[in-house]
């Protein structure tokens, strides 16, 4: 009898974990399709790494540009392809190389006072692990494309 209960419990666990894995694979596919369609939009630039971005306002061409050794002050909000906003700051100061790779790459393309929108594929973001605790406001599921609206206020 104990063996049957253990096997039953094991089967339920496998079924639940399999469903969750399928959900992540469906989410991955949705994100990949989003990026493929987004790349066709007018004004979208795709880099060799797969980062997509659009320039909303170019900023000052004569101003300093970010690099890994510099700090920046930015205003941003981040969301997923389904519109879920996971983060937003009116003012954030940090080193360029402390962001996820896609965000870092995008910042380096900006001029001071520029406004860009980044579309960061999961492999340049939080990868197949995601970020944060599931069920919390800041949770980012595995395989998520990150969409950031970024204003570069200052290069420090």
What are these regions (language model features)?
Residues 1-17:
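Sec-dependent bacterial lipoprotein signal peptides
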Residues 5-7, 19-156:
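Cross-family detector of peptidyl-prolyl cis-trans isomerase
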């Amino acid at each position: 009898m104990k063996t049957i209960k253990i096997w039953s419990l094991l089967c339920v666990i496998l079924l639940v974990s399999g469903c969750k894995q399928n959900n992540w694979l469906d989410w991955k596919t949705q994100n990949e399709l989003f990026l493929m369609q987004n790349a066709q939009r007018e004004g979208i630039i795709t880099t060799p790494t797969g980062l997509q971005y659009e320039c909303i306002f170019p900023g000052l061409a004569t101003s300093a540009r970010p690099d890994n050794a510099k700090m920046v002050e930015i205003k941003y909000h981040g969301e997923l392809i389904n519109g879920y906003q996971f983060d937003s700051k009116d003012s954030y100061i940090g080193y360029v190389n402390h962001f996820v790779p896609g965000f870092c790459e995008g910042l380096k393309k900006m001029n001071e006072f520029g406004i860009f929108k980044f579309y960061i594929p999961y492999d340049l973001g939080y990868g197949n692990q995601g970020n944060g605790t599931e069920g919390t406001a800041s949770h980012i599921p595995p395989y998520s494309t990150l969409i950031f609206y970024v204003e570069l206020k200052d290069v420090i």
